[in-house]
Amino acid sequence: MAWKVSVDQDTCIGDAICASLCPDVFEMNDEGKAQPKVEVIEDEELYNCAKEAMEACPVSAITIEEA
């Protein structure tokens, strides 16, 4: 299975918890907002990591959906 990861740039407040919890999937861009390092995750371990980051996001800016 594969999952698509996205971050709503208008919603993100740049607290970087996602990049801290899951640095293989998320990074901070030049504007101080989170962005995915990869658009599609095929590894279940990375999916679980990204899901944890999504649940920890204080403004619900992260979306994960089946690709």
From Swiss-Prot:
Highest taxon of source: Archaea
Gene Ontology MF, one: 4 iron, 4 sulfur cluster binding
Cofactor: binding comment: Binds 1 [4Fe-4S] cluster which readily converts to a stable [3Fe-4S] form.
Disulfide bond sites: 22-49
PROSITE patterns on file: 4FE4S_FER_2
Residue spans crossing the bilayer: none
Outcome (variant: residue 34 to C): The mixed spin cluster is converted into a homogeneous spin cluster (S=3/2)
UniProt cofactor(s): [4Fe-4S] cluster; [3Fe-4S] cluster
Coiled coil feature spans: none
Keywords carried by this UniProt record: 3Fe-4S, 4Fe-4S, Disulfide bond, Electron transport, Iron, Iron-sulfur, Metal-binding, Repeat, Transport
Limits of the 4Fe-4S ferredoxin-type domain: 3-31, 36-67
Binding site for [4Fe-4S] cluster: 12, 15, 18, 57
Record SUPFAM superfamilies: 4Fe-4S ferredoxins
Subunit composition and interactions: Homodimer.
Role summary: Ferredoxins are iron-sulfur proteins that transfer electrons in a wide variety of metabolic reactions.
Name the record gives this protein: Ferredoxin
Native organism: Pyrococcus furiosus (strain ATCC 43587 / DSM 3638 / JCM 8422 / Vc1)
